[in-house]
Design a protein with these regions (language model features):
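Core segments of cupin and vicinal oxygen chelate
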Residues: 2, 9-49, 84
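Short amphipathic alpha-helices within nucleic acid-binding modules
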Residues: 18, 76-81
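Short, charged/polar, Gly/Pro-enriched secondary-structure boundary elements
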Residues: 48-53, 109-113
Length: 120
């Protein structure tokens, strides 16, 4: 795998305001779904190209941010490799029921990046 960007996620302080803005700015299809963890996740379908999602920012006081995800073949190995290269693991490998696995790293410069392994 060439490790493409496969998903982008908006963690926002105001989901309704963000949905209103982006649905008017772009021709995105927004679809709410309930996560197994009890929060609403809005899927963003863009037609061709990389889609994404949005959810309520869960870190108190944190600003709204866009978080890109890169596809990997082995999420455990990629997360460990990132750590060995100086990254901080913000969220260790976690299963997203029915979809795949993710981890979130902070690179040595302070930039956040998600790693994603889809279920086959």
């Amino acid at each position: 795998m060439a490790n493409p960007f496969v998903h982008v996620e908006l963690n926002t302080t105001d989901v309704n305001k963000a949905k209103n803005f982006y649905s008017k700015l772009f021709t995105w299809k927004l679809e709410d779904m309930q996560s197994e963890m009890g929060f609403t996740y809005t899927m963003i379908s863009v037609g061709e190209g990389t889609g994404g999602g949005m959810l309520k920012q869960m870190m108190p006081g944190a600003p709204s941010i866009w978080l890109p995800y890169v596809g990997v073949d082995d999420i455990e190995a990629a997360t460990k490799k990132a750590k060995s290269l100086g990254a901080t693991i913000m969220k260790d490998v976690t299963e997203v029921a029915g979809f795949g696995w993710l981890s979130i790293i902070v690179d040595p410069t302070g930039a956040h990046l998600g790693l994603w392994k889809p279920k086959k």
